[in-house]
Each structure stands twice: as structure tokens, then as C-alpha cells.
């Protein structure tokens, strides 16, 4: 009797061992795959990283940071719908993360909605970005907010954001790229001002000048808002750009623990 019991226990242990070993081996392999995905991600090989992340996301409960990484990968693949979906899901769980890292996720979510022309959804994420991003990046964010409000025909808000952007860009006005952006802002702000005063003549906006270059504001030709919007819309198919490097938000010691 005792011999039969020992035999049954031995068989049971063997069955359990045979069952657990493949699971442990698979989990170890998947941890290696996650490490590989992080390497691809840090090297800006977003397509390769996304393929691995997608597989692991179907198998494991990836944490919010990894879901945010997936959102960034989708963004760089021009899949703005999935980028926004993953980032919106992940962002509420990232409150304890470093401020600038969070600003990257907010900005990417905003850009995803912007590129889908869902400007009302983009605005709050741009506004959250402003409170956390570097000073050097704030001009770009205000410029984007100006675009959102202009496309939504909220002329005063658009004008105000363009003025904020102009003020912030003045610190870097010697840079050639910034000079072009400043000239563009002057034209768009003037057009928004004209549109606003056409519908609210009793509330004239006081134009503030920051002397981008001597006489710019006096000689700039006003373009119709429809022409400006048409021109801007045609440029929205350009390759997406995020103003910080991915390596700034990913740690080389990123944990690769997986949970079922």
C-alpha cells in the first residue's frame, strides 16, 4: 500500500515537473524578447520593437510604461489611432514618473489626435505637456495649441497661443529654423486677429510685437485664414517628429519582469 502511494506521488511530481518546465522556459524566453524589444526601442527601431511588444501584450499584463512604449511605436508607424488608444490607457498610471518623461507621452498623445484632426482631444494633452516639458520645447507646444484653436475657429485663443509661441521663440531667434517659424506665426496671428475682429468688432485685440526682425510686423502681408489652413493641412502628412530622443525616457536597466 505504502509502495503504491510513493509510486503515485513520484508520478504526480514528474507530471508537475514536466508541466512547469516548459512554462518557466517560455517565460525566460519572453523576458529575453522583452529585453530585445527595449533595445530596438532605444535604437529607434520602432517597427521591430512593436512586433515583439504586440506579441507580449497578447500574452502578459504589461505595465503602463510598456503600454506607453507601444503607443510611441505606433506613433512612429503613423498609426495614430492605436498610438492614442495605448497612450490614453497608459497615461493615468504614469503619475509617479519623471516629469519630462510624462511630457513626452502627453505630447505624443496630443500629436496623435492632432494628426487625426481631433483637435479638441489634442488640446488637453498639449496643455499638460506645457506644465512639464523643457523651456526650449514650450514654443513648439504653444504653436501647436495655436493651430488647434485656429482649426477649431476659436480665433482669440489661437491668437493668444501664437503670441505665447512668439514670445517663447524670441529666446532662440538667431536660429534659422526659428526665424522661419516666427515669420509664419506673425502671419497666422494676424489672420486670426482679423477673423476675430470681424466677428467681434467691439473687442479689438491689441497686437503685441516682439520685433522678430525690424519692421516684420509692419510689412507682413495678411493671408486669408482659408489659404493658411489649406497650406498647413497639406504639410500635415510629413514624418512625425517628437522633440526628444527616446533614449531620454528609457532606462538601460529597465526591468523585464513579466506577469501573467
Report residues per predicted region.
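Alpha-helical segment of the N-proximal tetratricopeptide repeat
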Residues: 29-55, 59
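TPR/TPR-like (Sel1-like) alpha-helical repeat modules
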Residues: 92, 150, 155-173, 183, ...
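Canonical tetratricopeptide repeat
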Residues: 69, 108, 144, 178-181, ...
